[in-house]
């Protein structure tokens, strides 16, 4: 990870993820296994765009980027590979509009690796900001309930089983695919436009996968220039302490690692890496 990038800390978890979505997103959204915190998307949109600008999310999931964009008077386009989540994203956008959001948004069903053939070519060179997040290994969110007598029941903790989904591809394929997506995003951006990517490290068979550093390399390979690094907190700030907001699955991974002798700590932030199209 470069050490010379400007660095900021964003207090994006002053409320729990549930509180951030309550009354703003439909209940159907809960089932997605890896949702971006609304405050992260909202803060990025406020920082890198102006009202009336166009925002794109090539892997939009339940439409968090789109919802936060239209609530701030921006227009948005989202691409989603899985039909289930594309439908939820559309419903969330309609819900936002019913609440008075002034921006407009479109959800396109398709594979972001074919972004150039999916999105209307008329917007090429007009996009102010791309926000997205690559799939990041096993640390998805999901739902869980303890069973009587021990154990837990898990649900909504995995992506679909479609082998073409980037979430199921080997790391090398994931990075190649993400580089291709960023390359096509660069063509959509206006000169000086921004790409903001959330990423966090994860472990595979005990080995640390430094996804944030890999994301920067993908961006540079796609012709983008690293601009800023923002620490988007996943824990609340209270005076001189933090309030952990660790998911059941993240806590389980930490406990399992510690039992195996690996001194793992729960992650309290995501990197929001900002790159820029040359002017």
Predicted regions span which residues?
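Class I S-adenosyl-L-methionine-dependent methyltransferase catalytic core
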Residues: 1-279
């Amino acid at each position: 990870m470069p050490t010379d990038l400007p660095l900021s800390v964003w207090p994006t978890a002053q409320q729990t993820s549930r509180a951030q979505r309550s009354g703003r997103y439909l209940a159907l959204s809960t089932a997605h296994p890896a949702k971006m915190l609304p405050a992260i998307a909202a803060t990025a949109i406020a920082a890198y765009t102006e009202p009336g600008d166009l925002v794109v999310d090539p892997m939009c999931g339940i439409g968090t980027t789109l919802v936060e964009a239209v609530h701030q008077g921006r227009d948005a386009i989202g691409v989603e590979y899985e039909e289930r989540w594309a439908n939820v994203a559309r419903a969330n956008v309609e819900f936002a509009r019913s609440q008075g959001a002034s921006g407009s948004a479109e959800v396109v069903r398709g594979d972001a690796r074919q972004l150039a053939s999916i999105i209307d070519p008329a917007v090429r060179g007009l996009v102010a900001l791309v926000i997205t997040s690559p799939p990041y290994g096993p640390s998805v969110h999901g739902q869980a309930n303890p069973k009587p007598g021990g154990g837990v029941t898990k649900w909504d903790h995995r992506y679909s089983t479609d082998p073409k989904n980037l979430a199921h591809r080997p790391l090398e394929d994931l990075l190649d695919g993400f580089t291709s997506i960023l390359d096509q995003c660069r063509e959509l951006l206006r000169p000086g436009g921004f790409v903001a990517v959330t990423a966090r490290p994860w472990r595979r068979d005990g080995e640390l996968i430094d996804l944030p550093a890999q994301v920067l390399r993908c961006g540079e390979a796609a012709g983008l220039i690293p601009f800023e690094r923002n620490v988007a907190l996943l824990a609340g700030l209270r005076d001189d302490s933090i309030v952990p907001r660790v998911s059941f699955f993240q806590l389980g991974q930490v406990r399992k690692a510690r039992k195996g002798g690996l001194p793992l700590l729960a992650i309290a932030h995501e990197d929001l890496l900002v790159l820029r199209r040359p002017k």
